[in-house]
């Protein structure tokens, strides 16, 4: 493929240059990482938070890059294309270069619930007979493959290479998570979406976004920029930010489909909570559906409704989509039951690492907890510091016993992070060693108690400094339970 074809016509400033012999340069690959440049490749110099890719142009050219794209003029021994938005160029160019995508794709954004919704949509599609995949925080799951561990929204080159690979493998449907970072950094531009969803908005990524309004605006790029007019936007209607999402979708010319108690497309009329499931009554188009969802928590009902709405918006009949909800399997590390003691105390692992998510999890287990809620959690380093005391307050308000421990301290001092959480966690215990904190919590479990180990969920490593050490909350909980005679794992 030549440079003219890869560039397309989205950048008028390149028109004359691409009509010259420069446009005929053959491109054999595309990258924004100078270390991955190879003979015949196109290097796109993207400015990051810590470094500007333009500083590595010479390195990329030395490795064989035959052209460079930059946001400003740079010296190079190869043609340089200057564009207003290198990130956007990278995404659109990657989309053209790799070409193929699954025929039906949806993306979901929101502070919490993205992974579960993407997982549920995949499961509903599969139930309906489609070859379906999900892409997001827990990795890539598709027929015949489970690749765990990835960014919520992969970089554009990785993403489009993956989409082409999935399409070649026969995947026809794919559900993606759309993070605010990914949307703001143009990583999803060039993805052909059939429908999009919004779950909720709460405090997160305040180290990246200057205000909550900026955070919401980044989320809404999914509606106002990436979707074609008339496409369905499935919005959970019961969140404080739902009206703003509805307004953004309508202003973008999308077909709004709301779900939840205040929803018009899927109206939740009744919920009955049981220990490991919930019975819901949902109305759609004059028909009443009673559905047993095999998952606990109001937040899972919300996630299931958004997922059903997305599946229905991509051609799955309502009866099929809602029937599929009865077969759902929770996403890895999302209120996942790991085991129980011989006296019936339950031990869960959950990814909740934001105030709203932690509150949702703890309020969800209260109805079936006759004893105490014991919570083990910490906060990550090099991330939004403002949420640390908020999470400490949430944990102590909604738990009977709280143990504050280490999460992924990264480059920060772990003790300092814990102290910032403890400042608002009156009466909490502090045990820095996460494995020891989990063992101590398990040893305290009595009849009717519920243990929540929050923050890391599906992760299989703990980031200390620049090193990722092997660590799994699941394994630590199982190990601690194994030390208790008669526990079920």
Curated annotation (Swiss-Prot):
One of its GO terms (biological process) is cell division. ATP binds at residues 110-116. Its EC number is 6.3.2.13. Its cofactor is Mg(2+). It catalyses: UDP-N-acetyl-alpha-D-muramoyl-L-alanyl-D-glutamate + meso-2,6-diaminopimelate + ATP = UDP-N-acetyl-alpha-D-muramoyl-L-alanyl-gamma-D-glutamyl-meso-2,6-diaminopimelate + ADP + phosphate + H(+). Keywords: ATP-binding, Cell cycle, Cell division, Cell shape, Cell wall biogenesis/degradation, Cytoplasm, Ligase, Magnesium, Nucleotide-binding, Peptidoglycan synthesis. A motif (Meso-diaminopimelate recognition motif) lies at residues 407-410. One of its GO terms (molecular function) is magnesium ion binding. It comes from the Bacteria. It holds the Pfam family Mur_ligase_M. GO terms for cellular component: cytoplasm. UDP-N-acetyl-alpha-D-muramoyl-L-alanyl-D-glutamate binds at residues 34, 152-153, 179, 185, 187. Meso-2,6-diaminopimelate binds at residues 383, 407-410, 455, 459. It is found in: Cytoplasm. It is an enzyme of class 6 (ligase). SUPFAM superfamilies: MurD-like peptide ligases, catalytic domain, MurD-like peptide ligases, peptide-binding domain, MurE/MurF N-terminal domain. Pathway: Cell wall biogenesis; peptidoglycan biosynthesis. Carboxylation is probably crucial for Mg(2+) binding and, consequently, for the gamma-phosphate positioning of ATP. The modification N6-carboxylysine is found at residue 219. Catalyzes the addition of meso-diaminopimelic acid to the nucleotide precursor UDP-N-acetylmuramoyl-L-alanyl-D-glutamate (UMAG) in the biosynthesis of bacterial cell-wall peptidoglycan. Belongs to the MurCDEF family. MurE subfamily. This is UDP-N-acetylmuramoyl-L-alanyl-D-glutamate--2,6-diaminopimelate ligase. It comes from Agrobacterium fabrum (strain C58 / ATCC 33970) (Agrobacterium tumefaciens (strain C58)).
């Amino acid at each position: 493929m030549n440079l003219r074809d890869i560039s397309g016509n989205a950048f008028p400033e390149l028109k004359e240059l691409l009509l010259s012999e420069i446009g005929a340069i053959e491109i054999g690959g595309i990258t924004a990482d100078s270390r991955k440049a190879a003979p015949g490749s196109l290097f796109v110099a993207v400015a990051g938070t810590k470094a500007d890719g333009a500083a590595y142009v010479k390195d990329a050219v030395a490795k064989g890059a035959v052209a460079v794209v930059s946001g400003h003029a740079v010296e190079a021994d190869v043609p340089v294309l200057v564009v207003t938005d290198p990130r956007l160029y990278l995404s659109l160019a990657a989309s053209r270069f790799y070409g193929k995508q699954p025929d039906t794709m949806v993306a979901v954004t929101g502070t919490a619930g993205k992974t579960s919704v993407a997982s549920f949509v995949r499961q509903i599609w599969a139930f309906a007979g489609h070859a379906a995949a999900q892409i997001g925080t827990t990795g890539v799951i598709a027929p015949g493959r489970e690749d765990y561990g990835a960014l919520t929204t992969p970089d554009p080159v990785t993403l489009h290479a993956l989409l082409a690979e999935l399409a070649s493998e026969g995947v026809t449907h794919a559900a993606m998570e759309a993070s605010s970072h990914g949307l703001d950094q143009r990583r999803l531009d060039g993805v052909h979406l059939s429908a999009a969803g919004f779950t909720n908005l709460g405090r997160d990524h305040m180290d990246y976004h200057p205000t909550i309004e900026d955070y919401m605006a980044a989320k809404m790029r999914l509606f106002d920029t990436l979707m074609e007019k008339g496409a369905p936007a499935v919005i959970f209607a019961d969140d404080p930010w739902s009206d703003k999402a509805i307004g953004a979708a309508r202003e973008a010319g999308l077909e709004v489909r709301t779900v939840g108690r205040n929803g018009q497309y899927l109206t939740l009329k009744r919920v009955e909570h049981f220990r490991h499931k919930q019975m819901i009554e949902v109305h759609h188009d004059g028909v009443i559906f009673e559905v047993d969802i095999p998952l606990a928590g109001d937040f899972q009902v919300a996630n299931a409704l958004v997922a059903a709405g997305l599946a229905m918006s991509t051609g799955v009949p309502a009866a099929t989509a809602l029937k599929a909800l009865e077969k759902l399997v929770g996403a890895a590390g999302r209120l996942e039951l790991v085991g129980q003691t011989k006296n019936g105390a339950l031990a869960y692992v959950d990814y909740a690492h934001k105030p709203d998510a932690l509150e949702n999890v703890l309020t969800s287990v209260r109805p079936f907890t006759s004893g105490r809620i014991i919570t083990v959690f910490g906060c990550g380093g090099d991330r939004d510091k403002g949420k640390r005391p908020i999470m400490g307050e949430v944990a102590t308000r909604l738990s009977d016993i709280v143990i504050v421990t280490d999460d992924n301290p990264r480059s920060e001092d772990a003790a300092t992070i814990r102290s910032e959480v403890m400042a608002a966690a009156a009466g909490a215990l502090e045990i820095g060693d996460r494995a020891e904190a989990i063992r101590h919590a398990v040893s305290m479990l009595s009849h009717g108690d519920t243990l929540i180990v929050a923050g890391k969920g599906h992760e299989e490593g703990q980031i200390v400094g620049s090193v990722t050490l092997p660590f799994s909350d699941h394994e630590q909980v199982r190990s601690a339970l194994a030390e208790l005679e008669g526990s079920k794992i």
